[in-house]
């Protein structure tokens, strides 16, 4: 037999024998699981083919049900575990796992996101240890609670579980899954660009089942792109969680199933058992009562059939029933697009800009330098972690934080590294350069001032509770920043000594002044908090001076001369306040609908620019709040912008979470 034929023969053995193809594995996993196969020195007539079959048999029989030959696929679906140390969630999960392990006819377990409550490193490691007590394979996808409040910038989930996407086969069925976002910023879900690229590279086939934490409807900003790809690859069902209840949905012809949470929530913990026989699917809830799992009659029965994409799309790729602002708003000509391109990665931070160049970071660990003349990429540098930090620029130094646990300074001209300074955990905060110091916060309970030239610490304040994701307010008298422990800190910029701490009165850490970029005017600090309030604090003492209810969430801004402070509510209003008298100057309807974006409001000349979580911008007259224009850049959250005046108007350098980068121009009539 020729060498080629022999290799083909061995491949045939592997493909025919393996009932399961594993998701992406780390190098350590590959070495551990497949070490016996690494030393196969096959030759015709040797016993190596028999040895290979034995290795495969050992893999497939790590749990006996994987090699069951009845043709029926049976698996457990758990969702919304919300593991939190010391809470009832751990007890509920343990009871569900114990019950699953008693059911010998289950092939595997699917876990549909929100494994943790707050995405901390400790929560992720602890829930992984609990899931490892399952006595059969399990597959997970992260949910919004694992991604939005992740102190590691979504790195720990990938590191601990070994993957963010998966694809495997079981008894003729293909199962695929990916993350849902939103990565670090409050916004509707968005399947990341990296996951979308992975979906686009999947081969078309039949009998595919997709898992994602979210329902694939308008809960996900790019739902139409996801469902279009799912139909292309032959998906016949999408399963998920998020709603904490058993629900049957229809995604333009593609059936969707959402499973209950494992949480008892005043009742019993539980999960679902899904069975597929031929093309017939049934879903039954299992409630764990005491030590007994009670399986109920199926709450869903379906016949799974191929699905054609019958959705009608407009020229921009949006479905005709797209419920939000569409691109036709751009036809008014109030704002002109000079150039625009799409990065292959998510972008979750703003820009640094100087002259005809700008720099931005990506969630795939890239730093790119672009020309403002035409948007061309002048250079790109890669780093070993996701980047959620807006870079700061001073002279040749471009400085940013990375989820690999370092602050980097690179040469702005060519991307070469000048220095890096290690933190104890991921650095999600955006640096501020003032004088010869770099001010930046991390996830290790420490805020630092670093020497710009060397990266060596000038001072460190290690009394921070919660992790830092914002850009601090820095001036000659103080450094002000919030954390995900409900606290706002003010430090001395010279030595890092604590000046004061303000704490939100709401006990939940969800109500933290952590995403807002604070502003300061007339000796007052202004912040917006997810309790929907705008706070004015005495900059010297941290005492509350005034609280405005139901006008804000996490986004604020300030007039260039400090004469007005701006904030926006979740429900289509934007307001302006006088920082001197603390009176309301105006309040306007935005026309943009429900919006939870934390991105700061920008102001230039006599106009105020409000970014949204759906790729839109809206402009208002600064003097009275009159709506002036609207523009759609892309379909996802707008990141911090660069805005500058030009003769007769201004320009806006804009990026969005789904990877769009654009230069816009507005001509103003005085």
Predicted regions and their residues:
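Binuclear metal-dependent phosphoesterase catalytic core
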Residues: 247, 254-320
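N-terminal active-site segment of His-dependent metallophosphoesterases
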Residues: 22-126
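Short loop/turn segments that connect beta-strands within beta-propeller blades
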Residues: 371-375, 411-415, 451-455, 492-496, ...
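Extracytoplasmic beta-rich repeat domains
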Residues: 331-352, 378-393, 417-434, 443, ...
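His/acidic metal-ligating clusters that form di-metal
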Residues: 99-108, 169, 176, 185-255
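Active-site environment of divalent metal-dependent phosphoester hydrolases
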Residues: 43-45, 84-86, 117-121, 144-152, ...
